[in-house]
Amino acid sequence: YHSYKVLNTSEQEDVVSTQYVDMDGDILRYSPDGVSVVDNSMNTIWNETYTMQNPIADVNGSRAVVADSEGTSLYICDKKGVTGTVTTSYAIVKVRIASNGMVAVILDNDDNTWINFYNPDGSLVAENLTKIDDPGYPMDVAVSDNGVMMVTFQYVDGSKTTSYVAFYNYGDVGQNEDDRIVSGYTYENVVIPQVECISDSKYIALRDDGFSTYQGSQIPKESKTVLSLIHISEPTRHLRIS
């Protein structure tokens, strides 16, 4: 680009601690003091004040969640305002929101971790206690609009690092399964730090040696694994369904 045109300007006193994220054409603005949504002309659509030490956010379409990392408060919102608030019992590690407003949260109290699932109004759908040895420490979480939550766990067995990808179903399909886990895959000598929900029936796990994809709206199954060029052999995988 050789030139640009300024469309709008807005004064911001605390530019260091304020973050901006696109929110379906508008802008989500959040800081330790509060959250707001502004339009392209920088007109405030709504705002909410709070006190957080280290706010983090996740946006999916017209829905967003803002949480206090290592704190206990989170705000669920859409383009019209806050739809729900939650005060957790343990420290917040990570939050993810689906485009319908369902929220998944990883919590940690040093001894154990929890993965909680919330409605857009902040009411609790489910809470899952996880342990370091089984199924491991939750590294990341993704959530779809149809009530399926994807989690990647990591645990160490002797000198071997193992990752476990689990799919939880909070609809009718998962109600008779232990911990609502409808499918799961174990990957030996592999680290999976990130998972994503691409659609209601497509998921991806980003591995340190490539990536794996999964398909299925209710019971996702592994469909493909692509390894990077430096890994010529695929790790041993075992299907694990609780």
Stretches found by the model and what they are:
Residues 51-153:
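Non-cytosolic head/periplasmic domains of membrane-anchored proteins
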Residues 109, 132-134, 155-162, 174, ...:
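Repeat-based scaffolding regions
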Residues 40-41, 78-80, 119-122, 171, ...:
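Short loop/turn segments that connect beta-strands within beta-propeller blades
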Residues 2-11, 43-49, 81-87, 124-131, ...:
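A short beta-strand motif characteristic of beta-propeller blades
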Residues 5-33, 49-57:
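Beta-strand-rich domains and repeat architectures in extracellular enzymes and scaffolds
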Residues 32, 69-71, 100, 110-112, ...:
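Surface-exposed loop/turn positions within WD40 beta-propeller blades
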Residues 230-241:
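Single conserved hydrophobic/aromatic residue that forms the stacking wall/gate
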